[in-house]
Amino acid sequence: MIDADGFRPNVGIILTNHQGQLLWARRVGGQDAWQFPQGGINAHESPEQALYRELHEEVGLYPQDVEILACTRGWLRYRLPHRLVRHNSLPLCVGQKQKWFLLRLLSDDARVCLENGGRAEFDDWRWVSYWYPLGKVVAFKRDVYRRALRELSLAHAQLENSNRKELSRG
């Protein structure tokens, strides 16, 4: 499902643990390409439905394993480099338009599983600090990551503050 401008609708997933760290995953393929989980929105599927489907396909988690904390307001777009555009495909896809979700992990991180019946997207993952991905993601996605992280940073900071309060009471 590609829009009239050539952008494929997509969801991006920023998953945070109770320490405020983000799940950062390495793509299969051996090029040391790390990113947040993401995936396309199918026809007749809402962004939230796509989020939960992709969450399970890519990292093995279910809706009950997470809580949605925030979502970007509009679509964030990036263009694919010319070498990655499939010029012989119709309709032509020139990039992605994404809704980004910030999720809190409610379950133990041992539930993260990268092999879920289909072709695995990732072969490794780790927890990283909130702004770490900006210096590591592939260049053509960097602006979208910056905009998503900036827009979702208030919700993330509020979660970190509530976690600190719980620990100090504990």
From Swiss-Prot:
A motif (Nudix box) lies at residues 39-60. Residues 6-150 form the Nudix hydrolase domain. GO terms for cellular component: cytoplasm. Pfam families: NUDIX (PF00293). Its EC number is 3.6.1.-. One of its GO terms (biological process) is mRNA catabolic process. One of its GO terms (molecular function) is mRNA 5'-diphosphatase activity. It is an enzyme of class 3 (hydrolase). The keyword ATP-binding does not apply. Keywords: Hydrolase. InterPro entries: Nudix_hydrolase, NUDIX_hydrolase-like_dom_sf, NUDIX_hydrolase_CS, NUDIX_hydrolase_dom, RppH. Its cofactor is a divalent metal cation. Belongs to the Nudix hydrolase family. RppH subfamily. Accelerates the degradation of transcripts by removing pyrophosphate from the 5'-end of triphosphorylated RNA, leading to a more labile monophosphorylated state that can stimulate subsequent ribonuclease cleavage. NCBIfam families: PRK00714.1-1, PRK00714.1-4, PRK00714.1-5. This is RNA pyrophosphohydrolase. It comes from Cellvibrio japonicus (strain Ueda107). The lineage of its organism: Bacteria, Pseudomonadati, Pseudomonadota, Gammaproteobacteria, Cellvibrionales. The gene is rppH.
